């Protein structure tokens, strides 16, 4: 019912999908383009990686596909195009932009992250979320493994994102971030982030041309 309302209002609709079946249903419902988001992403995720998901989605539908999850530099952006995407949705690398209005502690936590600094909570509850590891995630995962009921798990995480974004609580807050956090080393203006992404594409493409395939 929402799709019809949005389309009637002239709104372009770009749903996020985590699988080919959902992509086909949303195409039939009238979506204008689809965002194929892999499980490398921060926040709520599916189970397929971007590498596996994007080509399956673009092969399943006639709509343009946008890749999301695990994209923070020119190498990853070019890979998204190679997988069949017409563009990319960025998330984690924009958290550490100057313009992003999250708490400075949140940004600092993202910049300190390594390749193994994220974890996924909520799988047992049926709502997996990728976030940075902290005291809250350790306690939550213990609670989850103990067989706690869904309502108890929901109460445990209530207000977690607010604590991260507004209060800067890096131990009890829900610091949503993707696996590319380990690539991010400094806070930059949005303009610089996008300019560097695009400026690096020719060199990456040339590197592929020059590379000897063994």
Where are these regions (language model features)?
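Conserved active-site-proximal phosphate/metal-binding subdomains
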Residues: 52-66, 72-214
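Alpha/beta enzyme core
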Residues: 1-66, 73-92, 171
């Amino acid at each position: 019912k929402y799709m019809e309302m949005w389309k009637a209002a002239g709104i372009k609709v770009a749903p996020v999908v985590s699988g080919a079946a959902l992509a086909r249903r949303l195409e039939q419902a009238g979506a204008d383009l689809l965002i194929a988001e892999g499980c490398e992403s921060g926040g709520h995720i599916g189970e397929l990686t971007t590498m596996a998901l994007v080509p399956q989605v673009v092969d399943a539908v006639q709509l343009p596909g946008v890749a999301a999850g695990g994209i923070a530099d020119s190498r990853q952006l070019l890979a998204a195009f190679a997988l069949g995407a017409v563009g990319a949705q960025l998330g984690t690398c924009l958290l550490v932009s100057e313009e992003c209005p999250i708490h400075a502690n949140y940004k600092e936590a993202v910049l300190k992250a390594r390749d193994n600094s994220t974890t996924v909570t909520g799988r047992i509850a049926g709502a997996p979320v990728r976030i940075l590891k902290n005291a809250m995630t350790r306690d939550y995962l213990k609670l989850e493994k103990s067989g706690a009921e869904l309502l108890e798990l929901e109460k445990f995480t209530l207000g977690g994102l607010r604590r991260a974004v507004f209060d800067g609580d890096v131990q009890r807050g829900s610091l949503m971030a993707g696996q590319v956090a380990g690539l991010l080393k400094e806070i930059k203006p949005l303009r610089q982030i996008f300019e560097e992404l695009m400026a690096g594409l020719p060199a990456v493409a040339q590197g592929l041309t020059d590379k000897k395939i063994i």
